[in-house]
Amino acid sequence: MDSNSVISQIGNTPLVRLKQASELTGCNIYGKAEYFNPGESVKDRAALFIVKDALKKKLISKGGTIVEGTAGNTGIGLAIVCREYGLKLKIVIPNTQSIEKKETLKKLGAELIEVDAVPYSNPNNYIKQSKKIAEN
């Protein structure tokens, strides 16, 4: 992967000294500024690992499709990574998610499948729906 690609920046986030926590504990406490990832979340790391691992194990190849049930930042991370690797992404998402999140996912190339927001115990829950779609 090109060192100037978007995904080459995943994980290259700075450590920042947490001043108040350091002073309270008497030792230096640092936090990783994960919001500097391209998708502004630690979930970018998980998405990159999952996709790279699936490609390495030949569970998917270029042009293939990943199906994910997500209402959060994992979807944005996956959309960024899938776009870089030439993979298609279908995201099953509750229809209660913000318009901004849905538009971001679409602009990153994800196909959205919106479903009613129901409890996990319901067979129509977005996570269970994504499993059904992936199995077909």
What are these regions (language model features)?
Residues 1-136:
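PLP-dependent amino-acid enzyme catalytic core
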